[in-house]
Amino acid sequence: MARVKRGNIARKRRNKILNLAKGFRGGNKNLFRTANQRVMKALCNAYRDRRRRKRDFRRLWISRINASARINGTNYSKLINGMKNSEIIINRKMLAQLALSDPKCFEKIVSSVSN
């Protein structure tokens, strides 16, 4: 039976982990065991936060819409309900952008919903 030498594969695997650990602090960037643990943790956090980012932005949009709606004499829930009843289809991202960049247009939307 022929002898199997695995040095290249093992080195490639370790270097892949150490390349992923670039930018980490201390031994976490150049000691394989700790780097491996840190990389696994970082990948878990990245996976979790990709899902969390969507929730966070939706919360931000809702709070911006609510703040602008209160300036115009209503609140978020009444505004969204009025938009559904009057069949105005604008998503929360666009509403928040309008509230920030074009307050006059947002004010017209609020007045058309409340009437």
Swiss-Prot record:
Listed GO biological process terms: ribosomal large subunit assembly; translation
One Pfam family hit: Ribosomal_L20
Signal sequence bounds: none
Domain of life the protein comes from: Bacteria
Gene3D superfamilies named in the record: 6.10.160.10, Ribosomal protein L20 (1.10.1900.20)
Gene Ontology molecular function, alphabetical: rRNA binding; structural constituent of ribosome
Assigned keywords, A-Z: Ribonucleoprotein, Ribosomal protein, RNA-binding, rRNA-binding
Cellular component GO terms held in the UniProt record: ribonucleoprotein complex; ribosome
Stored InterPro entries: Ribosomal_bL20, RIBOSOMAL_L20_CS, Ribosomal_protein_bL20_C
Annotated PANTHER family: 39S RIBOSOMAL PROTEIN L20 (PTHR10986)
Role noted for this protein: Binds directly to 23S ribosomal RNA and is necessary for the in vitro assembly process of the 50S ribosomal subunit. It is not involved in the protein synthesizing functions of that subunit.
Protein family membership: Belongs to the bacterial ribosomal protein bL20 family.
Protein name: Large ribosomal subunit protein bL20
Native species: Prochlorococcus marinus (strain MIT 9215)
Native organism taxonomy: Bacteria, Bacillati, Cyanobacteriota, Cyanophyceae, Synechococcales
